[in-house]
A protein has these predicted regions:
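Extracytoplasmic loops and strand-loop junctions of Gram-negative outer membrane beta-barrel proteins
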Residues: 1, 47-56, 66, 103-110, ...
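Gram-negative outer-membrane beta-barrel transporters
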Residues: 86-89, 111-192
Length: 192
């Protein structure tokens, strides 16, 4: 339970489940949780307008998440891989908007109407041929839905049901971690 002097009170919960099979190399797992994000000082108080009294009241974003996954380790190959499904939804998302005031327009942060949804699949693999080096290859597919029930103020066009901005549909990560005895750690990471 958290209390915020401007944005109200919020609580969050999480439940998890995991089962390790008898071979000790296979696991299924799942979780469900709720969460929130209080507005930052910038989001609460920044307004670009001729009238500085146009600061709006904002409340916390709320989220619900669910995931289920499968993990397998192949000891003969020193290979670990996972497959996961995730589903998230957000309400009262904090966004910057142009609003009308008695003295004209103002750009400020408001809670967006509608529900923003995100779901996808994640595949993770790690190969550890020895104690000094390992290789990770991850792929994530994300489908998002912008549930706002209003127009984009910058383009005056509807963006309901649109893919979220700055959320890639396809994401691939390649990572190499090298830990020789004379170095603490050396990493190479490639994101596409």
């Amino acid at each position: 339970f958290d209390e915020h002097s401007f944005a109200g009170n919020e609580d969050s919960h999480r439940v998890t489940f995991a089962y390790l099979f008898d071979d000790k190399n296979t696991k299924i797992k799942s979780s469900y949780g709720t969460g929130f994000r209080f507005p930052s000082l910038y989001e609460m108080f920044f307004v670009y307008a001729s009238n500085s009294n146009s600061i709006g009241h904002v409340k916390a974003e709320n989220s619900k998440s669910f995931d289920v996954g499968f993990e397998k380790f192949l000891p003969d190959l020193d290979l670990n891989f996972e497959a996961n499904y995730f589903n998230l939804s957000y309400d009262d998302v904090l966004e910057g908007w142009k609003t009308g005031t008695s003295s004209g327009s103002a750009y400020t942060t408001q809670n967006m109407p509608g529900t923003v949804k995100s779901q996808g699949l994640e595949f993770i693999s790690r190969w550890m041929p020895n104690n000094y080096i390992d290789f990770d290859l991850n792929y994530t597919y994300t489908s998002t839905y912008d549930g706002a029930e209003q127009d984009d103020p910058d383009k005056n066009s509807s963006y309901t049901n649109a893919q979220m901005v700055r959320v890639p549909r396809h994401l691939i990560n390649l990572k190499t971690n090298f830990s020789p005895s004379n170095f603490k750690n050396l990493n190479f990471i490639l994101n596409t």
